[in-house]
């Protein structure tokens, strides 16, 4: 099945005809194509951890426009939620409605480029998840026409309160640089989820050299 799942803070791409799940960093360059953005598609995703940011470019702007890949919630080209920011080639409406529980919040369109025969993903927002919610996969539609392979749909799911000793977030670094954070739950009461990598409750080194830092509430 052609499937890709984005949990609020991590991108996973289904790429090429093999339809294997790989992170963008794990793909060979021949598997990746940054095509011209469709209208209203996000051109980049930025995450901030303390003062460090990581940029994941999603597509290229056309008509002489550039994707504004610097953190700026006031540039008129951004949707900002917590330490996530999505960028757009053209000014984006700041009046997107808050999603209802049953509404499709975000869509990913996977398409085959007719020239290169490589897969490109485009991301579209229909509405914004409310505070303490994340974007969660709920439906996949396989397509057969117009070069489109599949559409992934996400809804808003509430982030649950952490249980005692539960990991509240995972932060990944590569060669000492921040890549992304994945929040798993929110800390109760006056507790906060640890952000200090030096005080991680556990770490794991991946085959590609990336390091996962597992944090608990303190």
Swiss-Prot record:
It is found in: Secreted. The keyword Signal applies. Residues 17-25 form a propeptide. Its main location: secreted. It comes from the Eukaryota. Contains 8 disulfide bonds. GO terms for molecular function: potassium channel regulator activity; toxin activity. Expressed by the venom gland. Residues 1-16 form the signal peptide. Gene3D superfamilies: 2.20.20.160. GO terms for cellular component: extracellular region. Keywords: Cleavage on pair of basic residues, Disulfide bond, Ion channel impairing toxin, Potassium channel impairing toxin, Secreted, Signal, Toxin, Voltage-gated potassium channel impairing toxin. Belongs to the scoloptoxin-11 family. Voltage-gated potassium channel inhibitor. This is Kappa-scoloptoxin(11)-Ssd1b.
């Amino acid at each position: 099945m052609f499937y890709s799942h984005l949990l609020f803070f991590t991108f996973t791409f289904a790429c090429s005809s093999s339809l294997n799940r790989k992170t963008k960093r794990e793909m060979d360059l021949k598997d990746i194509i940054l095509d011209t953005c469709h209208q209203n598609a996000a051109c980049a995703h930025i995450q901030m951890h303390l003062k460090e940011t990581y940029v994941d470019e999603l597509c290229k702007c056309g008509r002489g426009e550039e994707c504004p890949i610097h953190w700026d919630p006031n540039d008129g080209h951004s949707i900002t939620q917590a330490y996530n920011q999505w960028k757009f080639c053209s000014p984006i409406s700041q009046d997107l409605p808050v999603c209802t529980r049953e509404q499709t919040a975000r869509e990913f369109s996977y398409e085959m480029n007719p020239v290169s025969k490589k897969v490109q993903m485009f991301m579209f927002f229909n509405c914004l998840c409310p505070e303490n919610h994340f974007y969660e996969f709920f439906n996949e539609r396989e397509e057969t026409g117009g070069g489109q392979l599949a559409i992934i749909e996400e809804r808003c799911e509430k982030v649950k309160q952490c249980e005692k000793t539960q990991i509240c977030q995972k932060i990944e670094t590569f060669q000492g640089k921040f890549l992304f954070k994945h929040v798993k739950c929110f800390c109760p009461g006056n507790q906060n989820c640890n952000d200090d990598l030096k005080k991680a409750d556990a770490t794991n080194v991946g085959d590609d050299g990336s390091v996962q830092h597992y944090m608990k509430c303190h």
